[in-house]
Regions:
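Short glycine-rich His-centered loop
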Residues: 29-69
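Histidine-centered active-site loop/cap adjacent to the catalytic His
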Residues: 264, 284-306
Length: 306
């Protein structure tokens, strides 16, 4: 071996010695990429096969679903596309959660009040360590207010019908669903006063509820984004917009158009990426179908920077 050849070999060996220790570090860094999904029952995957949740005295038990969620939900599809296993992609979808509940969770790790009570002591640290965070929250703010108002207008009679509709019991549009719905409507047995109050609510009352809740939803989403940025200045945050879960109600269409416009502006303000999902395919219960989840995942993946 000539002196020149020896020098070249020595140089290559030195470079190899410098590079080789770095390669495992890159692999470890790749392995440590984590995704945390925050949201309500849409994120949970309610209505999909193999979604794990059950009712409890206080709320819903979804602990098993944090990691063992349906392969058809948008969280799974995003995780799979990014090559993440279930230890690196966590589904914190909370059935019945409102924006105020998620705000409590990111601030303290538990929900202070509301329909849904959840306790996630490790959440804040997981958010601080995450590389990607998706947030889809706010639809329930208006839906639950509407349910409450309809229950009061009908002295609780309508609630018995609304709960099965919204929890997936009558998810599929088939003969059995139509028969169940027909029977439920017949059994309402509303008095003339209750019927008048219900119709008034569906007419002008709903618009009032939407206008009242929209401002609070926007304020809560802004505070969630502030808290996420404080916890993790470097993570990519994707703020997912809203589809109309009740397309047969025109007032809701206007409400979600205005809400999308507001949260899109918030995303820009806090360095987040806004994703629009207006064409989500939904079932009778207002939750996305398998195709709907595919669509949401595609929209999110278009925005992911990995």
């Amino acid at each position: 071996m000539t002196m020149k050849t020896k020098r070249i070999a020595s140089l290559l060996l030195a470079v190899a010695m410098l590079v080789l220790p770095v390669l495992p570090a890159f692999a470890a860094e790749e392995d440590s990429y984590t995704y945390v999904a925050l949201g309500d029952s849409i994120t949970t995957g309610v209505g999909l096969k193999d979604t794990h949740f059950s009712t409890t005295a206080k709320s819903y038990d979804v602990q098993e679903n944090y990691h063992d969620y349906s392969k058809d939900c948008y969280v799974a599809r995003v995780a799979d596309a990014l090559g993440l296993d279930r230890d690196h992609a966590v589904n914190y979808g909370m059935p019945a959660a409102m924006s105020s509940n998620i705000l409590d969770l990111v601030r303290t790790g538990s929900t202070a009040s509301g329909v849904a009570y959840y306790d996630l002591p490790t959440l804040r640290q997981e958010l601080a360590d995450a590389d990607l965070i998706t947030l889809l929250i706010g639809s329930n703010d208006t839906v639950l207010q509407l349910m409450g108002a309809m229950g009061r207008a009908t002295n609780g009679k309508a609630t018995k019908l609304l709960i099965p509709l919204l929890t997936g019991t009558m998810r599929e549009l088939n003969l059995q669903t139509l028969q169940t719905l027909k029977k439920g409507l017949e059994n309402l047995d509303l008095t003339p006063e209750e019927l008048k109050a219900a119709l008034k609510l569906l007419d002008s009352g709903m618009e009032e509820i939407c206008d009242q809740t929209r401002g609070q939803t926007v304020a809560n989403v802004e505070q969630i984004l502030q808290e996420l940025r404080t916890l993790n200045p470097d993570a990519q945050i994707i703020l997912v917009g809203y589809y109309n879960p009740l397309p047969f109600l025109p007032t809701y269409g206007r409400h979600f158009r205005l809400l999308n416009r507001s949260v899109k502006a918030l995303a820009q303000q806090y360095g987040a990426d806004y994703v629009s999902i207006p064409y989500t395919s939904i079932a009778n219960d207002g939750h996305p179908t398998v195709c709907g989840h595919k669509y949401i995942a595609r929209q999110i993946l278009k925005a992911v920077r990995k």
